[in-house]
């Protein structure tokens, strides 16, 4: 599937960082051209998230209500509990009230349903998040659709995804794609007229990422690459901006990347590593050797992950602001 933005491409754009420049060829297509052999500049998600948190503190201080986030976690998946604890700590730093509901793995689905319905009725609660994954006997899609769309701070409710398709800005946007957009803006990356490739088409990352990049105001020309794409490597190598969100460790090698391209690694995968005391390490979807080809590269960990949590906080604050105005 290829999404083509209708905006004409032409003219010059400011260079991004010191490693790349923008040139216009005879066909009026913008290209990222390396000035020299490069080592990618780190696209630091931690620093970007810290900057966003400072802005959120100002918004919270001006809000007439205290933002309040509720997280429901079912089961004892260790990684899920780490993620939830990170979110609760972020709430504490910002002054967002948090409610943390822990349920055993054998909990009946109707119990979760009732929690959601009760939370929907709470006027002083602005965000509801169901931590994935859920036990197999639970229907995550159905549970997500029960959440009041105004409180759907994950941005996965069909109402919010539908607003995203319409190009509307009055809904909750999925946290990882919006976090990527925030990172690119923070790094002064101008997407106008650039060829962007999104590797992956999941409903929670790949598809909304493509929509955000093609939307008016971002104005990239977007290609979605997926498992049925005939030559994924060739498509990726054409990208000025490559977003890897496929969930396959180190799939994107340096020969998949155009010299000087901007690469955002959304993947976070646990891979076996006998050299580590714990027996594993975290790896992204992008191989480390891409740092010798790209101009900007987000690390794993420390890239998109912190931004996903920061955007969850931002969605919670936005929900509180909107609900206090009703």
Predicted regions and their residues:
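Glycine-rich phosphate/diphosphate-binding loop of Rossmann-like nucleotide-binding domains
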Residues: 74, 79-88, 168-258, 262, ...
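Glycine-rich phosphate-binding loop
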Residues: 127-140, 238-274
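Anion-binding alpha/beta catalytic cores of soluble intermediary-metabolism enzymes, centered on
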Residues: 130-195
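Short, well-structured alpha-helical segments in soluble
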Residues: 111-123
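Rossmann-fold NAD(P)-binding glycine/threonine-rich loop
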Residues: 143-148, 152, 161, 267-323
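Short beta-strand elements in bilobed, periplasmic/extracellular small-molecule ligand-binding domains
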Residues: 91-105, 221-224
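Positively charged, low-complexity intrinsically disordered leader regions
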Residues: 38-65
């Amino acid at each position: 599937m290829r999404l083509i933005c209708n905006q004409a491409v032409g003219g010059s754009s400011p260079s991004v960082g010191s490693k790349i420049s923008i040139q216009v060829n005879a066909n009026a297509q913008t290209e990222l051209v390396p000035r020299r052999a490069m080592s990618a500049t780190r696209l630091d998600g931690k620093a970007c998230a810290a900057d966003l948190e400072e802005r959120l503190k100002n918004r919270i201080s001006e809000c007439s209500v205290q933002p309040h986030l509720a997280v429901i976690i079912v089961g004892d998946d260790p990684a899920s509990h780490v993620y939830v604890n990170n979110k609760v700590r972020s709430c504490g730093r910002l002054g967002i009230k948090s409610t943390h509901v822990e349920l055993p793995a054998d909990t009946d689905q109707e119990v979760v349903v009732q929690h959601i319905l009760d939370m929907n009725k709470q006027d002083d609660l602005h965000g509801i998040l169901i931590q994935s994954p859920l036990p197999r006997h639970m229907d995550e899609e159905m549970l997500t659709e029960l959440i009041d769309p105004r409180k759907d701070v994950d941005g996965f409710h069909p109402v919010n995804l539908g607003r995203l398709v319409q190009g509307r800005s009055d809904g909750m946007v999925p946290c990882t794609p919006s976090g990527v957009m925030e990172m690119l803006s923070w790094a002064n990356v101008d997407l106008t007229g650039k060829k962007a490739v999104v590797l992956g088409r999941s409903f929670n990352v790949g598809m909304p990422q493509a929509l955000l990049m093609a939307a008016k105001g971002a104005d990239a020309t977007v290609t979605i690459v997926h498992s049925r794409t005939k030559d994924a490597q060739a498509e990726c190598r054409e990208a000025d901006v490559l977003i890897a969100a496929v969930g396959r460790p180190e799939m994107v090698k340096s020969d998949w990347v155009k010299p000087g391209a901007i690469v955002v690694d959304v993947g976070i995968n646990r891979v076996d590593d006998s050299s580590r005391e714990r027996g594993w390490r975290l790896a992204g979807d992008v191989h480390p050797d891409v740092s010798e080809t790209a101009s900007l590269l987000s690390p794993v960990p420390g890239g998109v992950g912190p931004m996903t949590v920061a955007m969850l906080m931002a969605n919670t604050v936005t929900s509180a602001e909107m609900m206090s105005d009703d």
